[in-house]
A protein has these predicted regions:
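Intrinsic-disorder/low-complexity, polar/charged segments enriched in Ser/Thr/Lys/Arg/Asp/Glu/Gln
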Residues: 107-109, 147
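Short, solvent-exposed mixed-charge patches
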Residues: 167-168
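Short, hydrophobic/aromatic beta-strand segments
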Residues: 120-125
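Asparagine-centered strand-capping/turn motif at beta-strand->loop junctions
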Residues: 110-118
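Intrinsically disordered, low-complexity Pro/Gly/Ser/Thr-rich segments with frequent PxxP/GP/PP motifs
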Residues: 48-72, 129-164
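Bacterial Sec-dependent N-terminal signal peptides
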Residues: 1-24
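Surface-exposed acidic loop/strand-edge motifs in secreted or periplasmic proteins
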Residues: 28-107
Length: 168
């Protein structure tokens, strides 16, 4: 009987460990962006990954993510989406949203919080609805222990953040 309870307990712990892991996959959803008081852009977004190849983050308007990363030679590697901040010294908080006024698009805003003791440098590509393609854009580095807001007047359906590094 003792062996049975031990086996049940070990099985429970193993199942809990497997299913309690932070998920890198976003479920499919409907992306809706306001254009003006009468028009909206809508698209079905399929199930996809937040972090691609351990170094690229893709986020959509309305998403807020917690990203942990390891540091190797001033480069951020092994990016991982986590469900909450359990390691504040290595977890970036990143949010992307649309700002509207009276149902009319005003601008898109990216918020990024740098938990590191050095400046955070990164690159951004934005997918502009106007052109239907990815465009590289300039962003400011985020000071150590601070946060930044980036804003664009264009309608952006998604952004890619990559080339994360720490600089003096």
């Amino acid at each position: 009987m003792k062996k049975f309870f031990t086996l049940v307990f070990i099985s429970f712990c193993l199942i809990n460990h497997i299913f309690a892991q932070d998920s890198n996959e976003r479920e499919s959803f409907d992306l809706v962006l306001a254009v003006d008081e009468e028009q909206y852009f809508s698209a079905k977004i399929d199930k996809s990954q937040y972090v691609i190849m351990d170094k690229i983050l893709q986020i959509f308007p309305g998403e807020k993510v917690y990203i942990e990363a390891d540091v190797l030679n001033y480069n951020l590697i092994n990016l991982k989406k986590v469900d909450s901040v359990t390691n504040p010294e290595k977890t970036m908080i990143i949010e992307f949203k649309q700002v509207c006024e009276e149902k009319t698009h005003k601008y898109m805003m990216l918020y990024i919080e740098n938990p590191y003791t050095k400046k955070l440098h990164y690159s951004v590509n934005i997918c502009l609805l106007k052109y239907g393609k990815w465009i590289s854009t300039d962003v400011y580095d985020v000071e150590a222990g601070k946060s930044n807001y980036e804003m664009w007047p264009d309608l952006i359906s998604s952004i890619l953040l990559d080339s994360f590094s720490l600089i003096d």
